[in-house]
Amino acid sequence: MRFFETLALALLTTGALAAPFRHPHHLLNKRDVSVVTSKVYAYTTVTLEAAASAISTNGAAKEAATAAGDAETTSSVAASVTPAASSSVAASVTPVASSSVAASVTPVSSSAVVDSATSAAASSSVIPTSSSVVASSSEVASSTTSSAAASATSTGSSSGGFQDGVYDCTDFPSDQSGVVALDYLGYGGYSGIQIGDGAGSSCVEGAYCSYACSPGMLKTQWPSTQPSDGETRGGLLCKGGKLYRTNTAYDNLCENGVGTASVQNTLGQGVAICQTDYPGSENMVIPTYVGGGATSPLSVTDNANYFQWEGKGTSAQYYVNKAGYTAEQGCQWGTSSGDYGNWSPLVFGAGMTDGTTWLSISQNPLTSQLANYNVKIVGADGASVSGTCVFENGAFQNGGSGCTVGITSGSGVFVFY
């Protein structure tokens, strides 16, 4: 795969395993050669059931630093996992070689693929805002930033669903139910633009134009036939100057997730949680901003019913910024000298397989930055939870680089405190 890097986020480290089906990330921040001046990144997130009994890796990874200190890797690592029979989460997992996955907060450069497994990592989208977003699993209330340039526009509803060939490509479909415009990204409200094997800055002829959905919802549009280059495509297609669905099995552009996860922020500052736009550009630009004292749903994918990659269920992930960043600041492409976006300290994962929701927290292996808060996963009232997952005072309670819980009934809550 040309021009991009694959990184295995430290979910394959001791105690850090969460969701075992594949969530590849390619084409991250990829740009056409005429407009790009920096290296391109692609993230492969692999989360595994913590009770996995065997992990093997092969392949090699090499790093090359750019002028900005960003790394590029030209090789990948394959991993096979033998899932445990029990749905419970084991307290530890045999760590793998450091050349494939980081066993500490030291940045790594590698790619990993799960060939067999039984759980999932997480995806979510949200209305970005500098002020508080208060949401429950059934209701989302948002407020927008006072800066018009950095605002995100929440959309109204459209009961009839999306109509192909009606909207101009330059007219973001903000009246569609659940769709959220990310105006501050500069793509005309879209979350990302893909043209051929590159990326663009506007929704033009032949482009896939991706979009964000409200908290607790997932986008429904991606072509059933994905390219052989391993880079995912997603969003609406611009054809003849008009927008068309790429997945006509859905009338609406957004659908509700499984509904088994949420975020509760008990801090005095807001936290920007940034979902990767997958399938699609795979940049971490779809924000969930949870203000101090607020709650928000977190979208959870269903392995059996959501996007399939080469016949395997896929998950999603969130980059979790330090408290104090707005969505507009934190859900942007960062650099190694920063501590936001892809360089934010933590990564959340969530997804469902066979009725069990797997939720995880892990250290972002790209950085040694530590979160300026504590966070744990707890069960909502009446939930059945296996395992413990706590990040407190700069370390994981289990002594590893991450942790996972399995929820067989009810829902889980990521609690900032």
From Swiss-Prot:
Protein name, per record: Probable secreted beta-glucosidase PSU1
EC supergroup of this enzyme: hydrolase
Signal peptide: 1-18
The organism's taxonomic lineage, starting at the top: Eukaryota, Fungi, Dikarya, Ascomycota, Taphrinomycotina
Protein family according to the UniProt entry: Belongs to the SUN family.
Any GO MF annotation of the entry: beta-glucosidase activity
Coarse class of the protein's main subcellular location: secreted
GO CC list: cell surface; extracellular region; fungal-type cell wall
Presence of the UniProt keyword Chaperone in the record: no
Function field: Involved in cell wall synthesis. May be required for the activation of 1,3-beta-glucan synthase.
Gene Ontology process terms (BP): fungal-type cell wall organization; fungal-type cell wall organization or biogenesis; polysaccharide catabolic process; septum digestion after cytokinesis
InterPro entries the record matches: Beta-Glucosidase_SUN, SUN
Subcellular compartments: Secreted, Cell wall
Keyword Metal-binding: no
Keywords: Carbohydrate metabolism, Cell wall, Cell wall biogenesis/degradation, Glycosidase, Hydrolase, Polysaccharide degradation, Secreted, Signal
The EC number(s) this enzyme carries: 3.2.1.-
